[in-house]
Amino acid sequence: MSAKQKNYAIETFTEPERIRNFCIIAHIDHGKSTLADRILDLSGVIEHRDMRDRYLDNMELERERGITIKAQNVRIPWVPKSGAHEGEQLVLQLIDTPGHVDFTYEVSRALEACEGAILLVDAAQGIEAQTLANLYLAMDKDLEIIPVLNKIDLPAADPEKYSQELANIIGCEPEEVLRVSGKTGEGVPELLDRVCELVPHPVGDPDAPARALIFDSVYDTYRGVVTYVRMMDGRLNDREKNKMMSTGTEHDTLEIGVVSPGPTKTKGLSVGEVGYLITGVKDVRQSKVGDTVTLAHNGATEPLQGYAEPKPMVYSGLFPISADQYPELREAIEKLQLNDASLSFEPETSVALGFGFRCGFLGLLHMEITRTRLEREFGLDLISTAPSVVYRVIQEDGTETFVRNPSDWPGGKLQAVYEPMVDMTIIVPEAFLGGTMELCQSKRGQMKNMDFLSQDRVELRYRIPLGEIIFDFFDSLKSRTKGYASLNYEEAGEEQADLVKVDILLQGEPVDAFSAIVHRENAHYYGNKMAVKLKDLIPRQQFEVPIQAAIGSKIIARENIRALRKDVLAKCYGGDISRKRKLLEKQKEGKKRMKNIGTVSVPQEAFVAALSTGGED
């Protein structure tokens, strides 16, 4: 690659007509990161010897789980070999988006920074529910959609069938669907030429006050928060004072630049360009995704549209297995929060589990990733309590409370309880349709509609309570459909429901870690299941231990752990029956006394086992 060509993508203040901002919308495992690797490789911004798989996924966990958690971006030079712009030196800015349902807000901000999107679908699997949801987001924002089938080198690929499916969804001709292989690089140059031709160039007012959209922010140990922005109007220069419009805080710009493929310092950014700012801020919550950056002096008065605070949808308690790890857990969560503004937490005390934190997450994947990172990056051993959602409870006297934790459930009579609802989309092969519908109905789902995407794939839409799907819904769905179903959900208001709190009592004492808020119809099932499970997990004591499930003061299920008995008659060889009776009576008295004063200690392993499988049938 010539030196002249090598430099031009690193220089900023490019005319908007030469810029193309685009992203790749794809499901987990459909080859988005591999395609991004090929694009970087072909454009020559990375020397072949420096190339590594999943180049844009920086986090070890991202590479291992094969998912993109944070949005990344890279600026690359490209000279099209075909189409209307043949031979022109264009600048492509690829914004890599997270593909998972929990990170929809991040995806919508990243889409806001683009004018076009490559819809990437695995030629052996077809489109998945989450890709469909992100596609609709992109269509709402009027992005130019370029449909592409990836992995055409696979023996199982069926490009004819899935080209037709994509054409039906987007409303184009099957011939317009491009076919590429991220692995071999086949069709990738043609794809980039198509991007240059079809994606419109950015439009903005270069003379207006600066306005830049934050689409991601990452915490760097040495430089503080690195904020990724897309310039909408005006320009930002190095060493200027800037202002965040949602909070009104002002900062000095210590460094401004572009990513190509590593951070490269520049003099500034102008309309349509994507780059990064470093302001010395130490907390990502001060540099919020979706916020507008402007100049502190003579800045814009109107922020960009669409900013929203990320709202936790699922709550769970995290407790260290050994109490002396509590300070380390606090420090670890605070460090994670530096990089993840949507994670919220507050200290919580449980009688059974000791000190820990009640954490709020965007969804189940977010929760699992956070927990995995805490355990792996910080070496902690954790117990997480069963996930719960936020209920709005109106008591008899009209007071309204929001319950995030079963132990905060108010006692006495309640006027009404409202639970969060979600609109759920499931794409499933027709053969598994019956089992999937049965599962959704058992979880109190109301069917909204059903569409056949192709002859053998169906899209189902349900309105379902969020509390029903956060437990084991996904696992049950996968096992009923042999792993072929895909799922997406988005919040859809709230609805009144007949919910009760089920307490689990050991010897008449409630154990807070096992309490759950369930629908009245499922209360007996949950109570019986937990009682049977705990009977197997808690070791036998010297006295009989009753395990009970209760709603308020009404017992709905009971199991007994039989007492261990010493054979007091072992020494009696023959002799009078009254002697034996006396010994047995004496033992019985002792057991009775023990039962009154004895306490049951539940081993940690029992907590871990009961809570980790709390949602399974």
From Swiss-Prot:
Record's subcellular location: Cell membrane
Native organism taxonomy: Bacteria, Bacillati, Actinomycetota, Actinomycetes, Mycobacteriales
Organism encoding this protein: Corynebacterium urealyticum (strain ATCC 43042 / DSM 7109)
Limits of the tr-type G domain: 17-203
Its EC number(s): 3.6.5.n1
SS bond partners: none
Alphabetical list of HAMAP family matching this protein: LepA (MF_00071)
Protein name: Elongation factor 4
Principal subcellular localization: membrane
Keyword Protein biosynthesis: yes
